[in-house]
Amino acid sequence: MTTPDIALPRRHVLDSTMAYREAGLVGAPIALFLHGNPTSSYIWRNIIPPVARVAHCVAPDLIGFGQSGKPPIEYRFQDHARYLDAFIDSIGMTSAYVVAQDWGTALAFDLAARRPGFVRGLAFMEFIRPMADWSEFHQVPAARDTFQKFRTPGVGEQMILEGNVFVERVLPGSIKRRLTDEEMAAYRAPFPTPESRVPIWRLPNELPIAGEPADVWTRLEAAHRALAASEYPKVLFVGNPGALVSPELG
């Protein structure tokens, strides 16, 4: 199993590269791990080892995150889907059991809708979905206020690009225990400059709330309809307290 301080293998993907962690049994069913914002495949470091006893685990760093490249793109949801597709194709993956959290869930739902038969099973938590209004976004009112600021022109850029608030405050604030210095260093490493934090800033602006952004809303509505109609096995992990997902959903 690769440790966070060792350079991960990379694949040439479109006009850039994507890094990934890989462990487990060659020839076994694939477990594809998809992280969210502002993390990387590092978030799965304690989950992959036990799963690797029965599966071939692959955990990419999404484009712009972790040790993956940062090409000059907008880092919209559609960009992440495009690069993830290319990564999957580059390693010849034809099906997988998917484990996803945060924006990784949106990518998983979208992937399953566009590639029938690819997803053999889905384990997910804190999932992204079309939300009618801000009251559906988060269980904590202060968090809703913060994310509304992230979407306010000029304010969000100052908070995330200049202040690195997402890494320094939102991430550690969403975890019950205190992150170690080593863990925080791993999460900070991909984002040393304001320019490098554009991928972090973009994703709060992609959240499908009250019909906006329209293209993301439409795409994820279709993905959720496909999810509801699908027959592959699924398991939803619900925390107490939850963040994006309330304990009542469990």
Summary of predicted features, one role per range:
Residues 2-24, 30, 58, 65-99, ...:
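Flexible "cap/lid" subdomain of the alpha/beta-hydrolase fold that forms the substrate-access gate
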Residues 22-67:
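Conserved HGGG/HGGXW glycine-rich cap/lid loop of the alpha/beta-hydrolase fold
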